[in-house]
């Protein structure tokens, strides 16, 4: 998935975040606010599934700038959705990026757009 950054009307081309080889077929995504926010919560669920609730944790959140552009004033809901799911003693830092690197399931690490990528570091106290 690549974020559509713009349209070049002169040569009738699309400008994407990340490489899209010439001649490739693309599909356009239609954004849904609630599904984007729910997706962030699901990412948090996957991240914390092996972390006991009593552990202190640091969540590093990397969200695609495309999500910020789409969600606008609702962007805080994305962060809140992750913190609602993560263990209660979690502190979170993060930033917006133009591409997120993360494995998907058992696949190798790949470049993604339009994702919320979380890394959780925890320790028992």
Which residue ranges define each predicted feature?
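Hydrophobic alpha/beta core scaffold segments
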Residues: 1-125
């Amino acid at each position: 998935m690549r974020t559509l950054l713009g349209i070049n009307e002169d040569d009738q081309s699309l400008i994407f975040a990340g490489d899209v080889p010439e001649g490739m077929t693309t599909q356009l995504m239609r954004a849904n606010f609630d599904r984007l926010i729910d997706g962030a919560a699901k990412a948090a669920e996957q991240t914390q599934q092996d972390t006991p609730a009593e552990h202190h944790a640091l969540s590093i959140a990397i969200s695609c700038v495309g999500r910020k552009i789409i969600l606008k004033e609702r962007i805080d809901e994305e962060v809140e959705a992750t913190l609602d799911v993560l263990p209660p003693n979690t502190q979170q830092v993060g930033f917006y990026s133009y591409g997120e690197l993360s494995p998907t399931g058992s696949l190798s690490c790949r470049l993604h757009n339009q994702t919320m990528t979380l890394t959780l570091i925890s320790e028992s106290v």
